[in-house]
Amino acid sequence: PNNNIDDIVPPPQHSTWEKYYSKDIQLSHGQITDIMGKLESDSNFLVFGLGYDSKMWANGANVDGRTLFIENSKEWIEKIQKHSPNLDIRHLDYESDMREAFSVYFEHEDKLMESFPAYLKNTKWDVILVDAPMGGGGLGNPGRMKPIYWASQIIRRTGHVFVHDAERAIESRFSKRYLEENLGRKPFVVDKGTIGGQRKLVYYAPVSTQLSAANASVIQPI
């Protein structure tokens, strides 16, 4: 008999995206796994933000779908394209200031739709990750008011929305207003595998899957 366990048990199979995972990424491996797990082979995935994790997102299971990145920094686009020239990236000037989040944009949908790129309406989006633009630090940063509202307008009824840095006031209040109250989606904190310094990720589940989401071990209801 063959007593070599390596010949009996097949080696673990890793997803393609895991080759591009780095501990420098601000989402935990468990959080990323949960997002990637929502992608079907034909899913369309919209990512607000561009970074060293972008090649990883572009290698999800949606091989027959599309992964699009929206980024407001031309310098950052140029930097990433040097290493990953085949990424589908669109530059966008949000024309917003996070200091005006609640005085100008909150519950003013006409202002939130300013600078909305019409091409986003041409695709049925199955998964959306809001991880940009800059919403902390410098006072002149655009904030994530618009991407959160846009996500509420273009996500499929059965689609999945994730908002990163959700502990911050803008992300929290705009998500509650436009994803939770307007769409009836229930928020769940995705906290699997988080370590110190990694920020809050909230999953806004489609109404049809809220029961299964609530029973999942990966996420905890707010």
Language-model regions: role of each:
Residues 120-127:
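A short acidic, Gly/Pro-enriched loop at the edge of an enzyme's catalytic core
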Residues 99-108, 136-144:
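Short, flexible/disordered intra-domain loops and linkers
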Residues 28-100:
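SAM cofactor-binding core of SAM-dependent methyltransferases
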Residues 46, 127-131, 162:
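Structural motif
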Residues 1-22, 217-222:
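Juxtamembrane luminal stem/stalk of type II transmembrane Golgi/ER carbohydrate-processing enzymes
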Residues 133-222:
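C-terminal substrate-binding/active-site "lid" region of AdoMet-derived donor-dependent transferases
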Residues 10-30, 34-43, 132-140:
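Glycine-rich phosphate-binding "P-loop"
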Residues 104-119:
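A Trp-anchored, charged/polar loop motif used as the substrate-binding/catalytic surface
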